[in-house]
Amino acid sequence: MRKALVLITFLLLLPMWVQAQKVGLVLSGGGAKGLTHIGIIRALEENNIPIDYITGTSMGAIVGSLYAMGYSPDDMEALLKSEDFKRWYSGEVEEEYMYYFKKNLPTPEFLNIRLSFRDSLKIKPQFLPSSVVDPVQMNLVFIDLYARATAACGGDFDKLFIPFRCVASDVYNKKQLVMKRGDLGDAVRASMSFPFMFKPIEIDSVLAYDGGIYNNFPTDVMRDDFHPDIIIGSVVATNPTKPKENDLMSQIENMVMQKTDYSIPDSEGIVMTFKYDDVNLMDFQRINELHDIGYNRTMSMMDSIKSRIHRRVNLDNIRLRRLVYKSNYP
């Protein structure tokens, strides 16, 4: 009799679960400003707002992928404050791992160009820097950081702790690349490879650059791949402004980045837009400040968010599910 009651209760509740409101979180690119996303996620978690799907570009892909593979906001903060992360985005090598016998003698030059007059005047491209940041440290960190998550999901991003997509750019064919399977580290690494700053990587014979070139706020990917009932968007970037004579990054942005639609129709969800006056691409040391900006804005909008999203998830249950998921890591 008891088993029958349990079965009946389950069958009665099943339609509610099947029809439960699904929530998608879309995170824009924006360099260090993307640290704001962590504060948003923390505020949503603390208020029992569900996050069922995540899409992100560039820094949004980094934060989104970490959460999707089972990192808590505390875990993300700890990682992004670590010395390992500083070496990742700066390209610096620890002193103990530097092998000076392989290094050329230091010179004051920024780049070295050699000219050949043998056949015709030409610049040998191997003497131009491929990126400002040496990619070796970043590549090693990405292997260590994402390898187990890739193995646990079998290369299927739908099987992460939270289903996830990120966007990279195919600059040859002038289109976005939606990353939904394969090596998670490669997908995120491609999504944040801003031209000149970071070296691109090759995925399936395609040279993949920062997703922000063609789609810095992938709401379309969220709609097409996951069909959520409501979308929460976090926008920490703007379309390129008029370039300045002495600002190389603004010049590059204007040359390569297409305009992005950072809006979400009211009927589809909520968008939080953040404006910054003095935060640069690499200001990662300001993580506490940027986290709090996201957290405080989300808390100020919580009544509005709760009025649109009626479903709740218990934070203790999320933590338990996270532990269970990560226990399957090889």
PLM feature spans:
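Patatin-like phospholipase
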Residues: Q19-T57, S65-P330
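Sec-dependent N-terminal signal peptides
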Residues: A4-V18
